[in-house]
Amino acid sequence: YRFMLKELLLKNRSYRRFVQNVRITREELAELVGLTRYCASGRNAQALKYKVVADVDLCDKVFPNLAWAGYLKDWDGPEEGERPAAYLIQLLDTSIVENCLCDDGIQAQTILLGAVEKGYGGCIIKAFKNESLREVLQLPEHLKIMYVIALGKPKETVVLEEMKDGDYKYWRETDG
């Protein structure tokens, strides 16, 4: 896949359902993380790190610690077979800095744009069970979870619409 920036941005949506059995290789995940080296970094601190979660068993342990689609109250998230193929856990190394300014968002967006270029999609997740997820990932104290980036081959089609009357809430068709 090759896209111009506007095309990448339009294709880069929050995908919440995936073709779960289409795996993403560790090499592809390393390439996505590698893109962040080219991002701006406040004071050039380079304080954001990533935990790559590609193993099926570990993915299964991460999943129940995530909250999906806050505006879709009657939806508990993707079902088995629709779950992400991998996760990149964005971590702030607090031994370097206490605040990453806006670097976390810049890097998360860069990772998703890279994923789109490879034919994948993802969702940046901020709603998670922090302590439980830290335990699952066996993280040392100085690493703070900033975001969970869920990745996979999208199983859904996202339709962009102009916002009407200030209503910014997303929705889902009854058939998913």
Q: Positions of the model-derived regions?
A:
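Acidic, surface-exposed loops and disordered segments
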Residues: 1-176
